Amino acid sequence: GLLSKVLGVGKKVLCGVSGLC
């Protein structure tokens, strides 16, 4: 649903910002 989409985008953003991926 919408929440899972938001969480998925959030994880991608955090991943890119933190440089952990």
UniProtKB/Swiss-Prot annotation:
One of its GO terms (cellular component) is extracellular region. The keyword Secreted applies. GO terms for biological process: defense response to fungus; defense response to Gram-negative bacterium; defense response to Gram-positive bacterium; killing of cells of another organism. The keyword Secreted applies. Keywords: Amphibian defense peptide, Antibiotic, Antimicrobial, Cytolysis, Disulfide bond, Fungicide, Secreted. It is found in: Secreted. This is Nigrocin-2. InterPro entries: Nigrocin (IPR032749). Its main location: secreted. Disulfide bonds join 15-21. It holds the Pfam family Antimicrobial22.
